[in-house]
A protein has these predicted regions:
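Hydrophobic alpha-helical segments and their helix-loop boundaries in membrane
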Residues: 1-277
Length: 277
């Protein structure tokens, strides 16, 4: 039995009645849409996972999503120019989804940096394996918290479902038409998501920011009443302790806020998909 016959049998078993080369081209387009989130978002791998594992995970996701593209395989062009254009389109969709899905994780890192700056602990650095970056102590804590919340909510399942929905709304062999509101609406939505990044960061950091502000105010009053007190050196001891205390007493508020913001993020994902359609 020759190789061509084996390929024909494999093609028939997959339910694909087109040339096998079209199937490979379609799968390459699918991988271009799937791999950016696998590579860039912490919960699907991020920088901590070896490239071989990320490629394997992307391949498995592609196999899971394969039934959604069976009707689109025949429409994939064999022309190199048209195929490259479709590949760029898939990369654009994948990168856009990666940006929207990763908004809460980026906001958590910014929130942690704000907390460390206000508490004076920003000189201490830790390596966060999810993003392979040196970040401050509370940035690390915030990133780990939102990652655990995301996985506990089954957010990774929702993201995979969003990929399936994207294949229905924007097939591999078709370009985005922006029929709903035009391309400017998509650009405006991405800008609003970017603005939400800082709003979420402030929301996650607000309990500690308020506590450190009150601490600074109290120390300022002490300095006015008793100038002989070395407030600067006192603050170096008090503010980190206050930050840790408030962080752990208000952690339920931070977790509730993270849950709420994930709902907002999932809404942004579906809105972006509708605008791309």
């Amino acid at each position: 039995m020759d190789a061509s016959h084996l390929l024909d049998q494999l093609r028939d078993s997959l339910g694909v009645h087109v040339d096998f080369s079209h199937l490979l081209l379609a799968f390459a387009l699918l991988m271009a849409r799937v791999l950016p989130p696998v590579i860039l978002t912490p919960f699907l791998g991020g920088e901590t996972v070896p490239n071989e594992v990320k490629l394997g995970l992307g391949f498995m996701l592609g196999m899971v999503l394969y039934p959604a593209i069976t009707s689109q395989v025949a429409g994939v062009p064999a022309s190199p120019v048209l195929f490259v254009a479709l590949m760029l389109k898939e990369l654009f969709i994948g990168l856009t989804l990666s940006f929207v899905v990763g908004i809460v994780f980026d906001a958590a890192q910014i929130a942690g940096n704000l907390v460390d700056t206000m508490s004076g602990t920003n000189q201490a650095q830790l390596m966060v394996p999810q993003i392979q970056q040196q970040v401050s102590l509370f940035s690390n804590l915030q990133i780990q918290l939102v990652t655990v919340v995301f996985l506990s909510l089954g957010g990774h399942h929702i993201v995979i479902q969003a990929f399936g929905e994207s294949l229905e709304r924007i097939p591999l062999d078709r370009y985005p038409t922006f029929a709903m509101a035009g391309s400017w609406a998509l650009f405006n939505t991405v800008l609003r998501v970017y603005g939400d990044l800082f709003r979420i960061a402030l929301a996650l950091a607000s309990p500690v920011l308020l506590a450190t502000f009150v601490t600074d105010l109290a120390l300022g009053l002490i300095n006015r009443v008793a100038p002989q007190v070395q407030v600067f050196f006192v603050a170096m001891q008090i503010k980190p302790a206050v930050t840790v205390l408030i962080m752990f007493t208000s952690i339920h508020l931070i977790l509730d806020r993270a849950v709420h913001e994930y709902g907002t993020m999932f809404g942004w994902v579906h809105q972006v998909l509708r605008l791309l359609e």
